């Protein structure tokens, strides 16, 4: 019979609860370990294991004594220190090992793991055991990428930090994974910001950075086009190359060599090389065209030691309209275009670099692709989602040419990137490229109207990084659940929801038939002829746009309140995008209200009852016009701050002038409305709507 004395009963009860607590702990721990953690990119193979506590800090070992491996260890340690995790001899051991070292071979053998042939260039194995955490790779690149995954698998901070126990085998689907950044239509980043870009690209396993130059690279042989303060110097380029090397990022410069050269060809010294006067296309038949190209690329090759140079050659719209008109009539547009690319290839052959070019010719003259040199690389570009991307890729693959794919972050001409379009475009195009055997991906950023902020683009950049590393069709929904936690350290999920709200705001405008939240809408005067037409279309969407933008602002504020967020500049840029979206819609609402209210006051000015309220209503209308001045003024300050966090002052005044013009417009209109009120007080008459610049018919 059991002993049920009071003392023993107490012991039994304590034992029961301890056992229950232990069972609950084991159950929760086991449940937690079955949850695949958020990772960008997602690894190919993942198995959960028991978590490792980092209560005593870490001790990182890279015994190969290789310079690159030592850098990977230092980079990892710096990241962990930012989380309050100390370096200590008593801490959890982290081993960064090469697979051909005795320690690496032993670690793999004990776990019955291996690196197969596809893993050798950039792949890695990562696993935890009772002895610590191991990253084993064949190359410095693989070891570095494994260390980047280690960073993402840490939860908590300081003494509460832990490492997600696991086994990972991972390697990329595409050899080259990059970002193409427009440095020629407005923003020119500072060297320090470019270094930040390199660090962040590498953290998400991107290995190519392609700066785009029209006239913004400084050349000793041709110094005129590159404006001081608005261009990249040789010294900056050399510093960036050196900085990128240990991060395993290759810089692939693009210098337009055919089209998009307006800011070169407007100089008198180069005017004779233009296809048409003050145009943008270099005339192939001019004797000075090829020497100019050779001078540019010879200097580029001396500064950028990577295996690739990008010659651009897209959108040569003026070809055949000027100096080559007769030749194009005789031979055809495609033949003249292809011939010039072949001549550029021959001229630059002594540089021993592979030439990338934009794949326009496949869209326009697919039959001529076979005439191109086979060692050139076609960069097929397209920025919309499609059911099939074969027409952009097949002409090159059928001709035996190597291809890269170039989707886009859809930032251009927008107050915030349209990620509805961008993510679907990347998902489909990158998967199609992998299927077609494309070796690379360049995710494009364009600044067509000069208002782009790079900090707004990280959402699309990270999805492109994931989709080019991961095989097949990448899951957009999974990425959207992971982004905020991985990029910003946001455990609340609020920033993920804020991104979705901004996507919904874009979608509301698309449904209304006004494309999406374009910069042009932000600047458009609702009382202009175009503005009145747009106001009719946009009116049904305005409330939905504002509710989504304001929801995003609320979620951003909540995420900030919850704790320390990483990448605060990107959070600020998201807030700016949301505020500009909200104001865009508010502007159309307010402008329509002013029109409708003034027309009603004007029509009823002889009504005895209505006359009692004219002065007060006119005072209110003047204030409503100043609301629009205030909206432009507030976002002006936010935009300027965001710009200067990443860019040189060059070009900023052009955007500030847009803000100042918009503010002045509504200041003048407010003053006219105030004057109309004064006229009423003095004479009890009102000026006509036309005399105040108010449209006759209210925007409906």
Functional labels for PLM-detected ranges:
Residues 2-21:
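Bacterial N-terminal signal peptides that target proteins for export
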Residues 22-32:
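Hydrophobic h-region of N-terminal signal peptides that target proteins for export
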Residues 39-41, 46-48, 53-56, 70, ...:
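Substrate-binding groove of N-acetylhexosamine-processing glycoside hydrolases
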Residues 64-66, 185, 384:
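A generic structural motif
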Residues 100-102, 257-258, 315-318, 361-364:
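Short, internal active-site loops enriched in acidic
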């Amino acid at each position: 019979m059991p002993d049920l004395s009071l003392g023993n009963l107490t012991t039994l009860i304590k034992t029961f609860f301890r056992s229950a607590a232990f069972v609950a702990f084991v159950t929760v721990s086991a449940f937690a370990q079955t949850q695949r953690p958020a990772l960008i990119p997602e690894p190919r193979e993942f198995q959960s294991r028991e978590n490792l506590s980092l209560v005593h800090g870490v001790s990182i070992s890279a015994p190969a004594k290789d310079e690159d491996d030592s850098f990977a260890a230092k980079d990892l340690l710096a990241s962990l220190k930012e989380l309050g995790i100390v370096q200590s001899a008593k801490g959890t051991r982290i081993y960064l090992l090469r697979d051909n070292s005795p320690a690496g071979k032993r670690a793999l053998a004990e776990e019955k793991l291996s690196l197969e042939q596809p893993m050798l260039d950039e792949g890695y194995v990562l696993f935890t055991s009772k002895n610590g955490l191991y990253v084993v790779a064949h190359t410095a690149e693989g070891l570095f990428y494994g260390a980047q995954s280690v960073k993402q698998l840490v939860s908590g901070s300081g003494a509460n930090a832990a490492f997600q126990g696991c086994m990972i085998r991972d390697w990329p689907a595409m050899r080259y994974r990059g970002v193409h950044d427009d440095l020629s239509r407005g923003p020119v980043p500072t060297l320090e910001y470019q270094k930040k870009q390199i660090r962040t690209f590498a953290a998400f396993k991107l290995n190519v950075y392609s700066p785009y130059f029209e006239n913004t690279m400084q050349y000793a042989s041709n110094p005129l086009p590159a404006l001081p303060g608005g261009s990249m110097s040789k010294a900056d380029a050399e510093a960036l190359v050196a900085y990128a090397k240990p991060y395993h990022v290759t810089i692939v410069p693009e210098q337009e060599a055919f089209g998009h050269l307006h800011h070169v060809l407007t100089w008198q010294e180069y005017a004779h090389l233009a296809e048409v006067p003050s145009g943008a296309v270099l005339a192939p038949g001019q004797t000075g065209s090829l020497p100019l190209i050779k001078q540019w690329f010879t200097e580029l090759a001396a500064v950028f030691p990577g295996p690739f140079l990008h010659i651009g050659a897209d959108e040569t719209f003026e070809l055949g309209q000027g100096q080559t008109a007769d030749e194009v009539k005789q031979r055809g547009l495609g033949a003249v275009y292809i011939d010039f690319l072949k001549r550029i290839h021959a001229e630059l052959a002594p540089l021993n670099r592979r030439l990338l070019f934009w794949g326009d010719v496949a869209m326009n003259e697919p039959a001529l692709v076979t005439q191109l040199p086979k060692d050139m690389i076609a960069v097929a570009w397209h920025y919309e989602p499609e059911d099939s991307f074969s027409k952009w890729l097949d002409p090159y693959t059928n001709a035996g040419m190597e291809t890269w794919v170039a989707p886009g972050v859809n930032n251009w001409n927008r107050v915030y990137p349209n990620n509805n379009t961008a993510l679907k475009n990347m998902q489909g195009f990158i998967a199609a490229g992998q299927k077609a055997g494309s070796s690379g991906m360049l995710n494009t950023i364009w600044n067509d109207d000069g208002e782009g902020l790079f900090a707004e683009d990280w959402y699309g950049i990270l999805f492109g990084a994931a989709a080019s590393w991961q095989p097949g069709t990448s899951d957009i929904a999974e990425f959207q659940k992971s982004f905020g936690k991985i990029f910003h350290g946001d455990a609340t999920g609020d920033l993920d929801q804020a991104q979705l709200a901004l996507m919904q705001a874009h979608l509301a405008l698309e449904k209304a038939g006004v494309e999406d939240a374009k910069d042009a809408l932000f600047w458009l005067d609702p009382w202009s002829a175009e503005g009145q037409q747009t106001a009719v279309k946009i009116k049904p969407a305005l409330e939905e746009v504002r509710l989504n933008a304001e929801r995003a602002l609320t979620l951003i504020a909540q995420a900030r309140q919850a704790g320390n967020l990483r990448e605060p500049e990107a959070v600020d840029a998201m807030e700016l995008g949301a505020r500009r979206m909200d104001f865009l819609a508010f502007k159309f609402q307010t402008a329509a209200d002013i029109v409708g209210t003034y027309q009603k006051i004007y029509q009823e000015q002889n009504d005895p009852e209505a006359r009692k309220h004219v002065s007060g209503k006119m005072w209110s209308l003047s204030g409503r016009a100043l609301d629009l001045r205030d909206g432009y003024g507030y976002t002006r300050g936010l935009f300027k701050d965001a710009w200067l966090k990443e860019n040189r002052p060059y070009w900023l005044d052009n955007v500030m002038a847009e803000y100042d013009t918009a503010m002045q417009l509504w200041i003048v209109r407010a003053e006219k409305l105030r004057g109309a009120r004064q006229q009423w007080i003095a004479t009890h008459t009102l000026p006509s709507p036309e005399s105040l610049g108010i449209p006759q018919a209210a925007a409906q």
